[in-house]
Amino acid sequence: MAKSIKGTQTEKNLLTSFAGESQARMRYTYFASVAKKEGYEQISAIFTETADQEKEHAKRMFKFLEGGMVEITASYPAGVIGTTLENLRAAAAGEHEEWSLDYPHFADVAEQEGFPMIAAMYRNISIAEKGHEERYLAFLNN
């Protein structure tokens, strides 16, 4: 039987990151609508595609959770939907925080607590999040 995550910091980190990925998905869906209304079809499509990828990230995290109630304390962007330019900046900043700070830290904690599969998941998703940031920055620099 696999080691339980119940009561660990890894369990809290999984729920925190699941919530973050879920919220990012919704923000990107909103941002896609703004981009489309502003005439940026390609950017709208990228926001939509990235939203779908964030959904898959959230699903990978959710599958490691074991049920029950888990209390977390976390800070999340409290929702301004701006112009496409502002939304690209906000999205790039969020992705940067995930791949450069949050997920490497969560991977290290998972490793220390004896959850190598969860650590690997965070490291793999970090690579994707870096790609998301780079894509958003490419639009900003165009």
What do these predicted regions represent?
Residues 1-142:
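Non-heme di-metal
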